[in-house]
Amino acid sequence: MPRFWTPHASARQRLVATAILLWLLGAAFYLLFIHDFVPDEALFWPSLGIALGLSGGVTLWVLQGISRKTWVVGDDLSGYGIKKKTLLLLACLLLLGFASWINTGYLIPRYLTRVIGSSAERSDLVTTRKHYGKHRTCDYSLDGRWSRGLLVSVCVDAAFHQAAPRQAFSVRLRTRESALGFIVEAVSRAPAMLNR
């Protein structure tokens, strides 16, 4: 944490820096481990607006603290020139904005859906896809109308993928739903009569 504060930083500065770090870690946790939440389309613009407002507000508040000398910059950053400080500020603003969008658009709505949502079932036409590469969420996933989300990936095992036809087929999704979106809890092949 020395990059966030000096040994003489105030308790408020330490608290705010810790809250920002936890906010960033929450978004990183979602990106790495959770991909089963499909947000409602109406949630996109409000979550983006909240994310931009939050990241901009926090950045302006920290800048104001730096200019008033109530926020003491760490020793590593105090030697930077104006160009490096500006680039670092823009990078921090983008990172905080992206993390805020993940948290307000995916992580918090997913948590609320888990707590207040109700169980439901839906069927959909999907295809399976094999993922290649070192950095992937899972080896096999489903593609359907709901998988259009940037951070949505419903994983299936190799046996499900190999048994699936190459064209679109019908699946039954067990979900937990709320007005914010739905969480895909389980996937099973729909009965033959639902296949098209």
Regions found by a protein language model. Name each.
Residues A11-W71:
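Membrane-embedded alpha-helical segments of integral membrane proteins
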Residues R114-H135:
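Structural detector for short beta-strands of small beta-barrel domains
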Residues R148-V154:
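A short macromolecule-binding patch
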Residues M1-R12:
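Cytosolic juxtamembrane N-terminal segments of multi-pass membrane proteins
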Residues Y132-R145:
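Short aromatic-glycine-enriched beta-strand elements
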Residues L77-L107:
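Internal/C-terminal transmembrane anchor helices
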